[in-house]
Amino acid sequence: MRNTIIFLLLFFTAHYFYAQDNVIVTGQLFDSETQETLPFANVSINSFADNVLVTGAITDIDGRFEIQEIPLGKYKVYFSFIGYASTQQNLVAGGLNTIFDLGKIELKPSTEALMEVQVTGKQATTNSDLNKKTFSLEDNIAQSGGSVLDAMKTMPGVAFDQEGKVVLRGSDKVVVLIDGKQSSLTGFGNQKGLGNIPASNIEKIEIINNPSAKYDANGFAGVVNIIYKKEKQTGLNGDIGLSFGLGALGKSKPDTNTDLGSFSVNPKLIPSINLNYKKDKVNYFLQSEFILQEALPNNEFTTRNYEDGRNIISQVPENRKQFRSIINGGIDFELDNKNSFTISGLYDREKHIDTAQVAFTDLNKNTRNRFYNWREEEVTRYINASANYRHQFEQAGHTLSAIVQYTQGLEDETYSLNDSSAVRVGRDKTNILAIENTTSISTDYVRPLKSGRIELGAKLRIRRLPVEYTITPGEQSIIYPDLGTFSDWGENLFAGYVNYLMEKEDYDIEAGLRAEQTDVFYDLDPVNAYYPNNDKYNYFELFPSIRYTYKLKDNNRFSAFYNRRIDRPGEPELRIYPKYDDPELLKVGNPYLRPQFTDAFEVAHKYSWTTGSLFSAIYHRMTKDQYMRIFSIDDSNPDYEIVNKIYQNTGDATNTGVEFLVSQDITNTFKLSASFNGYENVIKEFEGTLLFPVERQFTLAESNDIAWDAKITSEFVLPWEIAAQLTGVYFSNKNIPQGDQLARSSIDFGLKKNIWDKNGEITIAATDVFNTFGIRQEIVGNGFTSRYENYFETQVIRVGVKYKF
């Protein structure tokens, strides 16, 4: 019955908003005979269909003009000056290009008097870019007060994997940017941390499925760009907010028999502030959030069935007490009309303590054969500093910019392990200290053309991540011996790109090429007995991208895309030191991993009407040398039941799918939007060799399955002007390496009421109302089968208040 209710509610709930964009038109007027500039000449822009004036301008002392905020559409541009014959050009602004340089316009002297044209008019418009979807968080009521990961839950084509990573169209190979830049906070290609970034100070989130050559080549599934709020009004303005919540309100499955169990009814307190002060040519901005909470980020129940008849069950709850502070700020300087400079920085520090008691029970004998408890103390810190210089040439949109960025990520993690079984009673302690330092320098050049623009750029990025590993073993230690005490990973990236955009009346084209040279090394402690050789390699690769759009009408267009992408394993995927939160399911990296490459194809269509729009797409992606985690029994020690979960390159795979997004305003107070994403994952058969902790073969059977997800959101207004949002999400079964991930669903609900003469608002939000969004996986390995059920904290209720000034 509950599933039926959820299914029906899905049809009343993932509202998305396309970014709104206007265009700029520039040029310069000359006398055709003397080649002198024509100051104070008239430029008018009329609609093409009925020749009605839309807007216009008067040239400056040098004959230049710049007309801003022109809606997308088709126009006639008239140039006139007293004593000269007027001339006219056609202009097509379809959304691909935002700045049009009409170049040098010559007027011929004439004896006929010209009628002066009056300049008026402005109107808003909607960007029709088929490649980028922009989501405003202002109206995301059902997830208000939560994290960026919570906010993305209802976005079309977005899912999450077992480790809390964003999955776009079936893949977690996603690049996450903050204000257009990568940082150690969200990872360099290997995303992380989204579940710990509050969404209160985020203005919008962009999802780009087919990035152009301007973007780094990593992340074949796409790019997620998180954009912080930044006001442009003069004076002091901003907002201050406070959110309180309770999480893990119910249990999807009873805890196993331990004293601690799993945390429930977890309190959460998140104060936030957003400040902006602008005076003259200087703008100061600051955002800050603090998180004080108890949480349950993982709560995994495991059932393992071995070929010899043994059946073992366990539960690993990650009971967390956490404090986190994030400060993001900077200063914008307008040095003069042509030069600007921005200095910005981000500081993020988080400390948490995780505790767990884990009982391993033999189902056949109904006896506990092992009791394990652990305590993890971890401090993470991220520092990001950048300086951005921008030069604006005389021509609007003609810019040269340079960015210098330094980012540091620190991880200091200590595990205290206590183990009790028939073969040992003892204690172990491990500590990992990892400090990542990244320096990047990039420059970008943009030159508008008459019907497009050209973009050029270059980038240098240097990354270093040394790791210190300290073990304090007890008697009969469960820690693998001979791991060594250090490793050192580094990557140097040299890149350059060219990107060209051309926009015509019936079509537009964007084509680019990115070249990247990458040098990688990974030095290991010579003591390490499992990976005896250091690793070092380099490669040069080209990454083309192309987009073609055909316009049936301004509101009806088709696009075709192709791009080539890469996903490089980062140090977390390479790390040789196991994670001991579950001693019988040890997660470990592979220092010999290699990058995976993907060719992506897509055909998309968008049709818009006055009260809504329909987007549809067909996509196909071919991946070579993909890497993923492999489950394998470690039988090197007969006293322990250990399954390793090791990263490994596993050959080729394909991903083919369709996506639909529809949005409709039913009335002025009722909006309905929905998305559907269906895809086929094909994982090819593969045989390989695992080296840790002993060399052994594994076989990956070919897997072919169809999966889909659907999201529906309704927005409506209740009495007393209370805005409401109801969201439903459903993910079907899907194939994963060595098994399946089972279906799951969620219903979220939110209310928002403006108070204090609309200077404030109060929100109430409830996520996963029926507590059905846990992740369940079934794995078939060599010599065993297993079922993993992660009922982590998804059910949360929050109350928030915000004051705007």
Task: Give each language-model segment a name.
Residues 47-52, 74, 78-90:
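A short, solvent-exposed loop/turn motif at the edges and junctions
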Residues 48-64:
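Short, acidic Ser/Thr/Gly-rich low-complexity loop/linker segments typical of extracellular
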Residues 251-256, 297-308, 354-366, 412-421, ...:
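Outer-membrane beta-barrel translocator domains and adjoining extracellular loop/strand segments
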Residues 404-409, 434-440, 446-466, 478-613, ...:
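Structural signature of Gram-negative outer-membrane beta-barrels, strongest in the C-terminal barrel
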